[in-house]
Amino acid sequence: MGVSVFSQVWKVSDVYRLRADLGDASRPVLHRSAPWSEDVSALYVDSLINGFPLSPMVVQSCRDAQGRGVLRLLDGWQRVEAVVAFAEDRLRLPAGFVFRGETWGGETVEAGGMTLSQVRERYPYVARRFDTALIPVAHVKGDDDMLGECVSRLHGEMA
């Protein structure tokens, strides 16, 4: 059996909602590295806000114990956690954060070290960039062996 992959983009709100649906039992099937540090998580949020290219999260449609259709996260748990932590004010922007978008009246954005709530209050247009950031998602279908190979290939890890 082959693998079929289709690409999607999700907003931050989609990822936030997905986090609650996944639960602890659905952590990614591939663990490529140690958990992200706070600095790496903050840099991911910085990249979201500033529109830098991002690796896709990888999901699979499946059924839960009750037979409901759910998504299983195959790769990208740390990205989900970074989004959720920033949305819940448990993560701050990097100290050297530079906003690479347009500002109101050319003002300088000094949001380094701020939580999302602080950014919303002082720089609402920066917070809006986080809220509307598009996150790439690869939705794959196939058996578990093929799915593992698919994710490995997405990350350049040839067997």
Annotate the PLM regions.
Residues 15-16:
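N-terminal intrinsically disordered, low-complexity segments enriched in P/E/S/T
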Residues 21-30:
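A short, surface-exposed helix-loop junction/capping segment
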